[in-house]
Amino acid sequence: MKTCFLFMILSILTSCAIQKIKGVSLEQALSMAGENRAELEKVLEYYKNDSIKLEAARYLIRNMPFHFSRMEYFVSPEGERYVPDIRNFTDNQAVKRHCDSLQEKGYTIRKEIVYDIKALHSDYLIRNIDLAFQAWQKPWAKDISFEGFCRYILPYRAEVEPASDMRQELMEYYLPLIDSGKARNAFEACMIINKQFINDLKYKETGQPFYPTVEETFRAGIGECDALCNFATMAMRAVGIPVVVQTTTWTKMDLAHSWCAVLQDGEFYDFSPAYAGPDEYRQKLMTVRYLKPAKVYRNLFDADFKKSRTDDGYTTYLKSPLLKDVTAESLVYLCAYNYYEWKPVAIGIQTDAVCEFKDVVGNN
């Protein structure tokens, strides 16, 4: 579930971005890096003889000023950092009791924002770029454009989780599953991995008062929707599947909801990690009453300044250049009432009030 803290941070980021940054050039991004500039220049120097990887590195660096890690942890009375390993507890209530006892002993919770442009080093970025290109060569990823690769496979983060260095491990863990499944495209590869998620992940509150890390979700195998989506996005990108996180704020319930979407042939297909694949989750979003979103927003890595965001005096996360309203990208299902239930027979596209289904024949 999303929290007000996340919305507050996004609002702060948005306000700064709108007021000070009208699109960032490579040189502007480097100038924002401060002492970390030398690390970013090492990346550019490393790829100077590889034009396509150099452009990928430039893409990451240009957009790094908009991204950060949300770091949260306990600080002991002696000033030492501590984060409980939830695998060492029987359940989330035991984790909560442990955290409560820490605060009774004088531990405090510290929250800080660490900006990527000032913190990520050259070896981390080079490793992620090389592994992303390696994944892009897989058969199910071969038809993905360079633009699609940069936006949905290359990025080293999904949202505001602490930057993870798990791409290699996740690739080695999940790649054999797709290879053995002989996936022909990203959609099929996503189906295979999401079925494995059913064994690896479970929707469950951790009891931890902190924003989840990719590592914690993978090791413990539990998390709420934001944790599962962040992990699923990074796991799928690690094996060359173009995936993003999408969100909505509930209008009749507390908090919000996240799910993922995979890119196939220019269209995004929704799926819920460890719950429903891209062949069925959009139908659930449209037909299950409590899942129907009022608005759908896609989390971007590259800041979008094309759409006008007039300054009306209000600071809101909805103005973030990292959010794209994709409510209009609605797929619809043509269903037949078959044996006492509606069953989908075709997927179409909705444009305003018109729904289009192709190649539907027969009358039985």
Identify the role of each PLM range.
Residues 41-42, 49-220, 254-256:
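Secondary-structure boundary elements
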Residues 25-34, 47-48, 176-184, 189-196, ...:
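Hydrophobic/aromatic-rich core segments of domains that either
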Residues 330-349:
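Short amphipathic beta-strand segments in non-cytosolic proteins
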Residues 14-15:
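C-terminal motif of bacterial Sec signal peptides marking the signal peptidase cleavage site
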Residues 354-364:
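Short Pro-Gly-centered beta-turn/loop motif in secreted/extracellular proteins
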Residues 1-4:
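Positively charged n-region of N-terminal signal peptides that target proteins for export
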Residues 316-325:
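A short, amphipathic beta-strand motif
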